[in-house]
Amino acid sequence: YPLRRQRQMCIRDSGLIGQFGVGFYSAFMVAEKVDVITRKAGEKNAWRWSSDGLGEYTVEKASKEDRGSSITLYLKKDAKEFLEDLRLRTIVKAYSDHISIPIVLVKDKEEESLNEASAIWTRQKKDITQDQYTEFYRHVSSGYDEPWMTSHWRAEGRFDYSALLFVPSKRPFDLFHPDRKHRVKLYVKKVFITDDCEGLVPEYLRFVKGIIDCEDLPLNVSRELLQKNQMLTSISTAVTKRVLNELKKKAEKKPEEYVEFWENFGAVLKEGLYGIPNEHKNSLLELVRFKSSTRDGLVSLKDYLAGMKDGQENIYYITGESQEAIKNSPHLEGFAAKGIEVLLLSDPIDDFWISSMFEGYEDKKFSSVTKGSAELENIEDAKDKGAKDKKGEKKSKKTDVSLLIASIKLTLGESVKDVKESIRLTDSACCLVADEGDMDMNLERILRQHQQVADAAPRVLEINPTHPLIKGLVKKVKDGETDPILEDAALLLFDQAKIMAVSYTHLTLPTKRIV
């Protein structure tokens, strides 16, 4: 038993080996001379070590009543600030607040403890109250709100680390600022190293706050070594996986509370779906929530798949500047008529991440209702089945618009890529759609605002053969009339389509067609 106890004490104290030198060398950054007086337990004599840090030192006998060591710094003229109480308190609070050794400031023979001398993340979760977690969250985040989620764990294996992370209940005002960084602090053996460790957590988790304490990194690790450290890369991967899993559990067990989180941080989380290959994409997709054309509240992709119609092969979505603009889009008419759910995306990041999702989700591709052919004819609902005649053929109420299409093409020329009969329109006379393979119109709008593209690309104009206006124009064309109103009508339809598309910032001489 004595040997086992001695071995445990040696293991515990082995972490102290080499700790002194790191801080000691830094003393010469602010001191022109350093004296160390030390007396070993059991010996009468003490020794003074003195150096100016320029490569030479002296050792001589000294007097010291008690055992131990004392270090005296003779500060440089430009380092007198380190004699100020406030400066000392700030430094200790920032870097050594949680080390096990208490740090005491003595002033006028009165002692004041400057650090907590304990680290909450080293304790068992069962020994920590929610109030204590909240207090530490407010300390580490400089906030006053309650943590929406707390995640505390210790990992042991190829490398050991502890993590205590929080998701705020309120969104920071600078969450979308270009210079915004994550707020996770890196500690090594309870000593603060940096709160600006690139790659410690991914940018799309920059709302997460807390600490990660690594046991296996050296205290004097540099910023360059941190950026290239394989251990930190592995820790980052593990931490990201853990946080996403915790969010998934929260979403499944408390969906109402998850809605609150999504409204605060959903747009940031979706950033992880765009850009470089991400091994966590599937986990992120399971966390994404959408507004829908057929339901109130938010829906997940699993909810969407469960409600797909017979014959539906794609996950349909539409992007736009705002939810109000999207809901009034004519592109939704045909889908609404068949009861097909369309996901409504209005965050600026949506156009970027969803256009890069070539692999889709659960073998279903993402398809924009503003691009290509709608393929609605392959999806049937109860109304479609009731509209079939005895031979199984659908009754046709469409008007032959081929002559009108030719007339409109002649008028619009290269202003449009093509003119087609629409199967996605039920109420509106016309709309613009992007051809398959072309850039989505809302994405083009965003890029034009940032001067990333020049003029708007020509689009496909679709006309609704069941609309009274189109029927009237078809009659005029069939009657062989050369009425100038046909040309004006074509230009008016095109302008109306551009207004509804909200992707064109100007109209060509609109005053000529204002009545």
Where do the language-model regions lie?
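Single conserved hydrophobic/aromatic residue that forms the stacking wall/gate
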Residues: 1-7, 11, 506, 511-515
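GHKL-type ATPase core
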Residues: 12-113
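Short glycine-/polar-rich loops that comprise or flank the Walker A/P-loop
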Residues: 31-34, 67-69, 188, 313, ...
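Flexible glycine-/small-residue-rich
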Residues: 38, 51, 73-77, 166-169, ...
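GHKL/Histidine-kinase-like ATPase module
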Residues: 86, 106-210, 292-309, 313-314, ...
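GHKL/Bergerat-fold ATPase module
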Residues: 100, 114-123, 160-256, 260, ...
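Active-site cores of enzymes that catalyze phosphoryl transfer or operate on phosphate-rich substrates
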Residues: 258-293, 297
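C-terminal interaction appendages of subunits in large macromolecular complexes
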Residues: 275, 279, 283-287, 300-507, ...
